[in-house]
Amino acid sequence: MQLTVKALQGRECSLQVPEDELVSTLKQLVSEKLNVPVRQQRLLFKGKALADGKRLSDYSIGPNSKLNLVVKPLEKVLLEEGAGRRLADSPPTQVWQLISKVLARHFSAADASRVLEQLQRDYQRSLSRLTLDDIERLASRFLHPEVTETMEKGFSK
């Protein structure tokens, strides 16, 4: 379906997306078209803010709909992220941006966005499942790699 995204500053773009597309994927496409970083975007439909994890169909957004884009000032975004982010929540944004660039070389924009979203979900799930034993094992491997190598050689005989 065809959508129009209009920024309050007057710029706008038309996008072709499936009706069940994720809002986060739409934001990625808007970022590419209007050169507005995803984290500074706030998309509105009929005055209601759209949540990244929801699909366009969840808001009854149909063909030829018009969405409004509010561009949040970078300072405000950084303050929000700093206040709401725990240290282990996610790797630095630069890591995700680098992964996104690599994916963009090998996939279409929509596919790259979906792969990146899945990687981020898998990363969060893996972190949330770490036990204290897992963390101790990882720490031992980093702090004492020679012991780990010796143990692995002993098992392979």
From Swiss-Prot:
Modified residues (Phosphoserine): S90
Coiled-coil annotated residue ranges, if any: none
Record PTM text: Polyubiquitinated. Ubiquitination by AMFR and deubiquitination by USP13 may regulate the interaction between the BAG6/BAT complex and SGTA and therefore may regulate client proteins fate.
UniProt cross-references to Gene3D superfamilies, sorted A to Z: Phosphatidylinositol 3-kinase Catalytic Subunit, Chain A, domain 1
GO molecular function: protein-folding chaperone binding
Residues of the Ubiquitin-like domain: 1-76
Alphabetical keyword list: Cytoplasm, Isopeptide bond, Nucleus, Phosphoprotein, Transport, Ubl conjugation
A GO BP annotation: post-translational protein targeting to endoplasmic reticulum membrane
Keyword Hydrolase set for record: no
Principal location listed in the UniProt entry: cytoplasm
Name by which UniProt lists this protein: Ubiquitin-like protein 4A
Species for this entry: Plecturocebus moloch (Dusky titi monkey)
Lineage: Eukaryota, Metazoa, Chordata, Craniata, Vertebrata
